[in-house]
């Protein structure tokens, strides 16, 4: 087994245990887009069942945004061949998000609709958790997107509860790099399906990703340092909040 593959398994387990992501008898929806992260997450969460002293159930769920139905068909074949329980939700969310009637950011609307569909399906299936494939790079990129474009210090949570704790979104790859995930997918021969979204390469995330790639070329330790900084905030050395524009002080 390659060192990178062992490291992915180790960090997956560390993230699950440290953040308390999976418990005995959990029933978990694994959101599968067909990309490297969600495909490997589904594979490793099932593989992990052979090595841990707890039991949990997995249901792969693909929300088809309506761009290219072939992706849903390829995923359905993969789920059947590999023996995964699965659900395919066919929608027009992507088309609606990019349609003339939508005045919002298409990515924002599409993501909101897909998440709503996942919540609904989780309830139908009796699942209390939804596992997403976001990796450490995604979490760092979100951190910088919020700083650069949202004027706030915020990122993704490894575990985030909704509806009073009825359903939790979990991100088991919180400690795992995108590079190691891609390498392990290739080592295992897992299919990686291309995105059919027309906005995939035109987002703020792609701009931040290019910036991060430049930083990592100069110093590979930057990724880990930034991730740890997100939970090591020294408020003593941050400026006080500025007054909101248009509001007078006391």
Where would I find each of the regions flagged by the language model?
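Catalytic subdomain that performs nucleotidyl-dependent activation
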Residues: 58, 137-217
């Amino acid at each position: 087994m390659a060192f990178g593959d062992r490291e992915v398994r180790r960090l997956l387990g560390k993230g699950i245990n440290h953040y308390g992501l999976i418990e005995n008898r959990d029933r978990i929806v694994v959101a599968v887009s067909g990309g490297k992260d969600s495909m490997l997450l589904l594979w490793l969460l099932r593989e992990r069942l052979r090595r841990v002293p707890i039991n949990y159930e997995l249901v792969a769920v693909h929300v088809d945004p309506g761009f290219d139905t072939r992706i849903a068909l390829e995923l359905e074949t993969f789920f059947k061949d590999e023996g995964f329980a699965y659900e395919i939700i066919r929608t027009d969310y992507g088309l609606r998000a990019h349609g003339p009637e939508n005045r919002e950011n298409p990515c924002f609307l599409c993501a909101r609709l897909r998440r709503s569909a996942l919540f609904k399906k989780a309830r139908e299936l009796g699942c209390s958790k939804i596992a997403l494939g976001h990796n450490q790079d995604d979490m760092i990129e979100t951190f910088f997107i919020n700083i650069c474009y949202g004027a706030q210090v915020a990122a993704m949570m490894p575990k985030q509860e909704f509806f009073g704790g009825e359903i939790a979104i979990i991100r088991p790859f919180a400690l795992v790099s995108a590079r190691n995930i891609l390498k392990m997918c290739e080592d295992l021969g897992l299919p990686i399906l291309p995105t059919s979204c027309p906005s995939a390469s035109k987002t703020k995330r792609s701009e931040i990703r290019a910036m991060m790639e430049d930083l990592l070329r100069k110093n590979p330790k930057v990724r880990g340092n930034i991730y740890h900084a997100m939970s090591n905030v020294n408020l003593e050395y941050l400026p006080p909040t500025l007054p909101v524009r248009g509001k007078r002080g006391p």
